[in-house]
Amino acid sequence: MSVLGLGTDIVEIERIRSQLERGGDRLAKRILTESELAIFVGSGQRELYLAKRFAAKEAVAKALGTGIGRGVSFQHIETYSDEFGAPCVRLSDGALERMQQLGGSQIRLSIADERHYAVATAILC
């Protein structure tokens, strides 16, 4: 299995917290899919959840070689946890089309946080 793309992103959690305070859930509704938004609403650490998802989606978009835009939106990239709690990605629309164009079949995702930052790395295989 060869690596077709690699993406990494880092997000300052305080920046997300500030945006949530100023704009309410507007940012979350732009970034998260419906199922992600349901988890966000019930989360006790909303800014952390959103920061990690933002970083993950940016990392995936970078691995696809497009970034957000150019046919790939936040809504085309959905994160979820497998039965062991590992982060996974489900692509749709422009993101799925781009992965298929590149000959990819899966994306491996790692998400972490430490006090002030959330970071994610995505590998397209």
Swiss-Prot record:
Mg(2+) binds at residues 9, 58. Coiled coil: none annotated. It is found in: Cytoplasm. Keywords: Cytoplasm, Fatty acid biosynthesis, Fatty acid metabolism, Lipid biosynthesis, Lipid metabolism, Magnesium, Metal-binding, Transferase. Its EC number is 2.7.8.7. It is an enzyme of class 2 (transferase). One of its GO terms (cellular component) is cytoplasm. Belongs to the P-Pant transferase superfamily. AcpS family. This is Holo-[acyl-carrier-protein] synthase.
